[in-house]
Amino acid sequence: MLMLILLAAVLAAFLYALHFGYKLAFQYEDPLASPYNYPDTDQTRKVKPVLDPAIAAFLEAPYEDVSITSHDGLKLTGRYYHVSDGAPLEIQCHGYKGNPFVDFAGAWRIAKNAGRNVLLINQRCHGGSEGHTITFGILEKQDVMAWITYANNRFGQVPMLLNGVSMGAATVLMVSGMELPDNVKGIIADCPYDAPSNIIKKVLGQDMGMPVKLVYPLIRLGGMLYGKFNLNADSPVEAVKRSNVPILLIHGDDDRFVPHPMGCSIAAAAPETIEFHTIAGAAHAMNYVTDPESYRAIVTAFTERCL
């Protein structure tokens, strides 16, 4: 009897650890947070005078609420910003526990000024989109494919760009390795991680001081048990090897969350399709607001070639 009690206690502790790891990595408790609630750090304070007015302008722009249903039955929401009928479309995908109005405060304006319509999506578990599990791009790539289908059904085969920041960048890079319609002409990836497993291990070890070899297997198993997905099912660094779509990859060299070398490893994996640029002094997801002129020039040159 005592042995059964001990075994039950061990099993309960193990399941608790799995669920703790799952909640830590894959759940978001504040999906409707204000865009102005971005982290207050020495890096963000430097760009605040540029970032806050850009967010405000984005929030004031007219839009249409849109939604689709994901392959696994979730309602996914977004905003559509119309410039002109028949114009190229840019689908914008924000980052992990991020806010699209922060991540695309600059890119939205670049697209608008270039005459592109914009479809700004809320990733699953974020904003008004349903879901309980963030999967670091593993299932989100299927969501982006669903948005592409929605856009083609609604707008026809207009030229299309995919644009992602942080986890959104990793997502669109994983999409790049899938079978895409011919009207997807280019992909912009801003500060992506090279693999879901690598960014989680980096955060656990470097940022949180946890024993990676002990905690990461629990997190991965928790994702499989409670989230029904496998962190190792795909990665940006592998997906780009299967891609034949032009890719623009931008990374700040002062990115302390997703280190710059991760961008370098992705670029090295597919040099024939990836154009890689570094923004000096830029923090994570702050490339545009750190150097708007250079960022605008890089994106404009790339999109003009693609479209």
What are these regions (language model features)?
Residues 242-244, 249-251, 255:
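Short beta-strand/loop motif that positions the catalytic acidic residue
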Residues 290-307:
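Catalytic active-site module of serine/aspartate enzymes centered on a nucleophile-bearing elbow/loop
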Residues 253-258, 285-286:
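Acidic catalytic loop of the alpha/beta-hydrolase fold
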Residues 108-130:
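Conserved alpha/beta-hydrolase
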Residues 134-155:
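Alpha/beta-hydrolase active-site loop
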Residues 174-230:
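Hydrolase active-site cap/lid region
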Residues 236, 245, 259-268:
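Short alpha-helix in the alpha/beta-hydrolase fold that links the catalytic acid
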Residues 6-69:
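An N-terminal hydrophobic leader/cap segment in hydrolases
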